[in-house]
Amino acid sequence: MIMETESPLSITSPSPSDSTFQVDMEKTMHALPSSLLDSPLLSTNEHYPPKSTLLLSGPSPIRNIQLSATKSSESNSIDYLTDTQNIFPNFVNNENNYQFSTAPLNPIDACRVGERKVFTTGNVLLSADRQPLSTWQQNISVLSESPPQNGIQSYISSSEQAAQALTRKPSVTGFRSSSLNSNSDDIDIFSHASRYLFVTNLPRIVPYATLLELFSKLGDVKGIDTSSLSTDGICIVAFFDIRQAIQAAKSLRSQRFFNDRLLYFQFCQRSSIQKMINQGATIQFLDDNEGQLLLNMQGGSVLSILQLQSILQTFGPLLIMKPLRSQNVSQIICEFYDTRDASFALDELDGRIIHNCCLQVAYYDAMADSVSTSSASSLSVPRGFSGMLNNNSEWNNSMTMSSNQETPTAASCAVSRIGSSYGMSNNFGSVPLGRTESSPAWGTSGYYDVSSTSPVAPSDRNPSRQYNSIRYGLDVNPIAPPNSSRLKQRNSDLLNGINPQWSPFSSNTGKVFDSPTGSLGMRRSLTVGANASCSNPTNLSFASLTLHDSKADSTLSASSLNPDLNLQRYTPTVEKHASDRNSVDYAQIASGIDTRTTVMIKNIPNKFTQQMLRDYIDVTNKGTYDFLYLRIDFVNKCNVGYAFINFIEPQSIITFGKARVGTQWNVFHSEKICDISYANIQGKDRLIEKFRNSCVMDENPAYRPKIFVSHGPNRGMEEPFPAPNNARRKLRSIASAQQIGLFPPTASKC
């Protein structure tokens, strides 16, 4: 049943456990600004029957979770359940097991992924949406307390259901745009979907504000390039979410704009935009975050598929996840539909330790230059890694596998996709299969398709299904800020399985794990009590974990490395490539080639305050910047050694750099040398969007990001920071801060 409540809610577990997770909703709601309290997400109006999905959502099954409240009245959910089953006729309702829809996703419409309803045993209604108040600690602790049994682990619980799925044909007509005449039209267009729309036939005199208003109605717009609008009637629109980009494309095909004008569009790949930038175009919205993350797992254990999926889906819906290389299951690539979810996941998970496993996370660029070695064969994957890694087999469009089969082998996990881009779903001949009865495992040449919530495998070889692919070498460069705490001595380590500062358990007494060191010289450590089981990480509950900060020696000796690791695999070329990408070149700025405006100021004395930093910058650049944020370690109220500043004009970077870079700060007896590099997030608007829904805006005003007037007579004067505009992200940030602290000093956030 869906429960209507008039009192604070809490998430509890029926069975007593040391790791029971509770959220104080009353305290959380008081932390929200009044402007968000009227949000439909928080409304008790009967027009929003699945309102409990704000607390519990996500396609990953979580057992033994229920909503409890006082003074509650039950509302009848039978009609809603019936309506949902009418919408999804292939939905299987089994009272004993968790069930997912056995119908393959429509290959032309990824937007329906967020609409799929999932029901579980009991009275809790879950939806395939994100989990704002649930944290990844809750998910992993629940998995540890109640490891999935054979009957629960399988998303298709019986061989009969799997057999039915094999005979079911996916519908390709249900979500077709009204202006399309055939299924092949959708397939041709949306098989190459991306987050970028190349729109033509626009009026050449239309204002930028009008375009922004138009496309914002179709989805969350990341940016619009109008450099060719006045001459050719062309613009490039970037969306945060690829599903919204697809929906916007459908709207453009079925509607007319600007006095009955039909707009034409084409999906534009990131590589094409990068070529335009290389040829002198000024496109501000392109950055390293394409929703793709590279996760490297270090330590005594590797998280299972179910655990990783449960953790990652806490931050938002996943498009895909798979191993980086076929023989290494400790390096995983995942992609979120929404790039903002990827940024949030990176911020929260990088440097975290879960069950004797240290997670190192960085952005992954599938189009980056590969570093090939003669000792390893390259991997063939399509753009957006929507296809499948399989060095010894062709692309396939159909498969057969028994539901009670053992763990998939090297050739058992494969799938064919429509097109070579983001691959919204399985191909026509492909159907999702149930998980095996053995524990979840990565196929050595497979991946885990979270869109269909099940591994898939090939049976036939179909030469007609061959697709063009891009060859990648053994080592691929993850793009992140150079010389930051995340990338300093870590780019190549991350890709080659080396973590110089990671030490597994060595005894049964209290142990300390150190995550990578931040700029402050502080490192995030996690102590495990002696009562925790070290031999079996799945028995390790979060109740026995304690986070603390300790002084760390920033130097690295060879003896601190694991002797079992192969140090010869270190590839300085990868780190150099990332460093060159974000290094500041005054000549390129002066010539107008590099138009980036946001930089990271590094090596700041830790006792420096934000006001002191403003005074330091104003000596040479007063009134030339409109955003400033000195990141703070809220444990000791000191900065973490770096700040982010957005200059109004790129030429101001030259003025500041020539005056300050390479000089000492000459304060607090510090011998640090000022340095700068480009930040990942560029532009005042995008920086505001990143921080406006963050818990940091609830801290002391002296610790918050500051924005300033960019133009006009008041240029350089501080202006109010915009209020939050996303209730989910705000609630999620509050819950995360309650559990793991606010912005722990593990990595750079911009």
Curated annotation (Swiss-Prot):
Post-translational modification: Inactivated by phosphorylation by ran1/pat1.
UniProt-annotated stretches for the region Disordered: 1-20
RRM domain span: 195-270, 293-361
Gene Ontology biological process terms, A to Z: cell cycle switching, mitotic to meiotic cell cycle; meiotic cell cycle; negative regulation of conjugation with zygote; positive regulation of meiotic cell cycle; positive regulation of metaphase/anaphase transition of meiosis II
GO molecular function, one term: poly(U) RNA binding
Gene3D superfamilies assigned to the protein according to its UniProt record, in alphabetical order: 3.30.70.330
Cellular component, GO annotation: cytoplasm; cytosol; Mei2 nuclear dot complex; nuclear chromosome; nucleus; Tor2-Mei2-Ste11 complex
Conditions for induction: By nitrogen starvation.
Self-association and partners: Binds rad24 when phosphorylated.
Purpose of the protein: Crucial for commitment to meiosis but it is not sufficient itself for the commitment. May be a splicing regulator.
Miscellaneous notes: The expression of mei2 protein is negatively controlled by cAMP.
Protein name according to UniProt: Meiosis protein mei2
High-level lineage: Eukaryota, Fungi, Dikarya, Ascomycota, Taphrinomycotina
